[in-house]
Amino acid sequence: MEEKRTAFIERKTTETSIEVDINLDGEGKYDIDTGIGFFDHMLELMSKHGLIDLKVKVIGDLKVDSHHTVEDTGIVIGECINKALGNKKSINRYGTSFVPMDESLCQVSMDISGRAFLVFDGEFTCEKLGDFQTEMVEEFFRALAFNAGITLHARVIYGKNNHHMIEGLFKAFGRALSEAVSKNTRIKGVMSTKGSI
């Protein structure tokens, strides 16, 4: 019987209290409450389009700003992905997705390599969308990548509408992650000549 690729992590600091529950072999079901409406929406899209079940509950110091809440959520989601992957046997390892959203086009490519790295290429023309600071998009993906052990490249190829560009990135991340964590029966062990990831 296949081992379930799920994880639950709870993290508490003086700034945030976070619970994340993830199922990499899910159906895209979600229950998200970070206290930041726009961020909730982006995580819901990531879950739905990545076919990953995701529950996130956050109590953060939003009276300061969104920084700690968004970054710490990225940390815990990254830790959950890494934990749920287990020994990483038979996974594709690599995933790439291009996602159009009206006038914008975004690309996310990843390698579940155990080597944490982020290349982010995207500029936004407004400071906030709702209560979400747009500069936190990059910080979220950095926190997630470094705690999941993923080499991640995320870029806005072109676009004008800030909402569309950010939405494209989160959808593309979900789809690329789904591809990378999917199992291939032809892969014996892990996808590495070193024998480990």
From Swiss-Prot:
The protein's annotated pathway: Amino-acid biosynthesis; L-histidine biosynthesis; L-histidine from 5-phospho-alpha-D-ribose 1-diphosphate: step 6/9
GO biological process, one term: L-histidine biosynthetic process
Location of this chain's protein in the cell: Cytoplasm
Primary residence: cytoplasm
Alphabetized GO MF terms: imidazoleglycerol-phosphate dehydratase activity
CC annotations in GO: cytoplasm
EC top class, as a word: lyase
SUPFAM superfamilies assigned to the protein according to its UniProt record, in alphabetical order: Ribosomal protein S5 domain 2-like (SSF54211)
Catalyzed reactions: D-erythro-1-(imidazol-4-yl)glycerol 3-phosphate = 3-(imidazol-4-yl)-2-oxopropyl phosphate + H2O
Keyword annotations from UniProtKB, A to Z: Amino-acid biosynthesis, Cytoplasm, Histidine biosynthesis, Lyase
Enzyme Commission number: 4.2.1.19
Domain of life: Bacteria
CDD domains: IGPD
Any Pfam family the entry gives: IGPD
Alphabetical list of NCBIfam families matching this protein: PRK00951.1-2 (NF002107), PRK00951.2-1 (NF002111), PRK00951.2-2 (NF002112), PRK00951.2-4 (NF002114)
Family statement: Belongs to the imidazoleglycerol-phosphate dehydratase family.
Protein's name according to its UniProt entry: Imidazoleglycerol-phosphate dehydratase
Protein source organism: Clostridium acetobutylicum (strain ATCC 824 / DSM 792 / JCM 1419 / IAM 19013 / LMG 5710 / NBRC 13948 / NRRL B-527 / VKM B-1787 / 2291 / W)
Gene from which this protein is expressed: hisB
